[in-house]
Amino acid sequence: MIVPPSRKRIDRNRRTPVWIFVQQICRFAATVFFDLKVYGAYHVPKTGGALVISNHQSYLDPVILALGLDRTLSYMAKSQLFKNPVFAWLIRSLNAFPVEQGAGDIGAVKESIARLQGGFLLNVFPEGSRTEDGEILPMEKGVALLIRRAKVPVVPAVITGSFEAWPKSRKRPKTHAIRVVYGSPLNLTNMDRDEILATIDKTLRKMYDDLREGKIPPSPPRPKGR
């Protein structure tokens, strides 16, 4: 049974010692092996519940998305990964929670909504699974339900290079440049399910094409007086 985050005595934005330790190691590795560059992270709210939706290229994606942020990023993980007690402790320390793939896991949906409404930053891949060829897959319907129920800011993000670094056909990752771009929060208010899915699909594809073409978003404006 999953305990809703509202019952846990934790700071939604606090980076635990485990999180900080793992993040520093992963940042070093990502810089050395993947030349990781992250753009537009200022679009992600500093506090409060928010949903980050991204294309899904490889197992690297949840970690890659989290490395460019100043907040902890909560995410779903396959239930099989929680069978090993030590590894389960580690990924729970990194704000992961289990989901049964392909089973219409209502518990995972409820947990996602509870986390978002409880002030967490949550990552969801609306495609539902990793790409087979690097291209963006159709959006799954469940993400629209999550967005309509949670009523929190929705920040789009895209990743390139992660597929080349670790495609489904490889057992281990290889060196390849990876780029991440966060976009402006989407206005999905009063949209029905199909409109939400169409907006997400169009936004992610446009951002993905732009990033592959080398179109890097501008840096945020500097505060006055600096």
What is each model feature region?
Residues 2-17, 107-226:
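Non-catalytic C-terminal accessory region of glycerolipid acyltransferases
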Residues 8-10, 14-17, 28-47, 221:
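N-terminal signal-anchor transmembrane helix
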Residues 1-8, 44, 66-67:
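A short, flexible N-terminal coil/short beta segment enriched in small residues
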Residues 24, 31-32, 39, 44-103, ...:
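Catalytic core of membrane glycerolipid acyltransferases/transacylases, capturing the structured
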Residues 37, 74, 179-181:
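Generic structural signal for residues positioned in beta-strands
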Residues 36, 40, 76, 89, ...:
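Secondary-structure transition/capping residues
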Residues 34, 71, 176-178:
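Residue-level signal for beta-strand positions within conserved beta-sheet cores that form or flank
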